[in-house]
Swiss-Prot record:
Cofactor binding notes: Binds a second Mg(2+) ion via substrate during catalysis.
Any one of the GO CC terms: phosphopyruvate hydratase complex
Family, similarity comment: Belongs to the enolase family.
The protein's name: Enolase
Encoding gene, per UniProt annotation: eno
Length: 431
């Protein structure tokens, strides 16, 4: 009854108005699953390949009909009759069929959409919520926790059309007792930040991930605005709420230096790490993501040395959810946390392997969306299933972001005390 009888691919739209891939997997007995692949704006060079058509006369080259054809052709043929509950086998069949290091033949977007659809179909067959099925696949059945949200309320960099260099300024409601309470805290800060910006005559337009995107004099100004918003909302910064940054430093790394054009400053690798450290001394910043370029391993070693015992240093472009690269980081004491993005590696099985490797090494784990999202909320289930501890899925507006928060509310309601919200204890470095 769990045999695959059909696999369907189609082109749909993501939250930025670009095409992306959606897949369906159908099983005997009428069970099925459907999932969509997200897409990033600031991407690591070692990510698995997102296959685009390149036809400039259609969606400016961003169509995904080639990836869809791969689903409806070779992938479908290879998976017909296979057992959907054997996720590792399905993913390996697709990986072998592709035969490349970065999935550039079939496309990571095609493979991922089918991988996640198969997991949903298998969960349906087993009569389980998706998080419970993923937990079984991960060997963590019944070991649930609700993630601390990393809420991107102010955008810069590649996620916004403004002069702010750092890509994301986020709040984490670490003092909340439940996920529902944490969501309320974040929403109230978000709405108060809007008022603060309006009072200063600044733009309240939003970026790709729903955060505000005003022009500000400096990155420190962004932190100051958020501090005011937190206080206006009635919360204590550093106690109820901590701050987090995603520098996406690869985006402003040029010729061995870090060029913050918005501030008119240029830093060496160590100089930029010192600059970030100075910000952590002025504000209660508990987490910094991609604080250096993905290839600047010497710089990362210094950054980890000076901040790794106090601050969560998250590798996104650095590790790209890849166990081979993560192992190098672990072996060399680089960073102390990993950002997990399904589409950086291209299958559920490989994603779970990266999460387990990180946790086994004492690294913290942050499950993440991409800037180009859909209504698909699989990452919410993944975060709970693996007890990841943290989730990064945007601001408190745009339904593509809120869909994940709403799914987490439903899961918390279902699990109750079986899925505790641990708050501050989830955000700690390895040391």
């Amino acid at each position: 009854m769990s045999k695959i009888i059909n696999v369907i691919g189609r082109e749909i739209m993501d939250s930025r108005g670009n095409p992306t891939v959606e897949a369906e997997v159908h099983l005997e007995g009428g069970f099925n699953g459907m999932a969509a692949a997200p897409s990033g704006a600031s991407t690591g060079s070692r990510e698995a390949l997102e296959l685009r058509d390149g036809d400039k006369t259609r969606y400016m080259g961003k169509g995904v009909l080639k990836a869809v054809a791969n689903i409806n052709g070779p992938i479908r043929d290879a998976l017909m009759g296979k057992d959907a509950t054997n996720q590792a086998e399905l993913d390996q069949i697709m990986i072998d069929l592709d035969g490349t290091e970065n999935k550039d033949k079939l496309g990571a977007n095609a493979i991922l959409a089918v991988s996640l659809s198969a997991a949903k179909a298998a969960a349906s067959f087993k009569g389980l919520p998706l998080y419970a099925h993923i937990a079984e696949l991960n060997g963590t059945a019944g070991q649930y926790s609700m993630p601390v949200p990393m809420m991107n309320i102010l955008n810069g960099g590649e996620h916004a059309d403004n002069n702010v260099d750092i890509q994301e300024f986020m709040v984490q409601p670490v003092g909340a007792k439940t996920f529902r309470e944490a969501l309320q805290v974040g929403a109230e800060i978000f709405h108060n930040l809007k008022k603060v910006l309006q009072e200063k005559g600044l733009s309240t337009s939003v970026g790709d991930e729903g955060g505000f995107a005003p022009n500000l004099a400096s990155n420190a100004d962004a932190l100051a605005m958020i501090k005011v918003a937190v206080e206006k909302a009635g919360y204590k910064l550093g106690e109820d709420v901590t701050l987090a940054l995603d520098c996406a430093a690869s985006e402003f790394y040029k010729d061995g230096q870090y060029d913050l054009t918005g501030e008119g400053k240029v830093f060496s690798a160590n100089g930029f790490s010192d600059f970030l450290k100075s910000l952590t001394e002025q504000y209660p910043i508990a987490s910094i993501e991609d604080g250096l370029d993905e290839s600047d391993w010497d710089g990362w070693a210094y950054q980890t040395q000076i901040m790794g015992d106090k601050i969560q240093l998250v590798g996104d472009d650095l590790f790209v959810t890849n166990t081979k690269i993560l192992k190098r980081g672990i072996d060399n004491n680089i960073a102390n946390s990993i950002l997990i993005k399904f589409n950086q590696i291209g299958s559920l099985t490989e994603t779970l392997a990266a999460i387990r490797m990180a946790k086994d090494a004492g690294y913290t784990v942050v499950i993440s969306h991409r800037s180009g999202e859909t209504e698909d909320s699989t990452i919410a289930d993944l975060a709970v299933a693996t007890s990841a501890g943290q989730i990064k899925t945007g601001s408190l507006c745009r339904s593509d972001r809120v869909a994940k928060y709403n799914q987490l509310l439903r899961i918390e309601e279902q699990l109750g005390e079986k899925a505790p919200y641990r708050g501050r204890s989830e955000i700690k470095g390895k040391a």
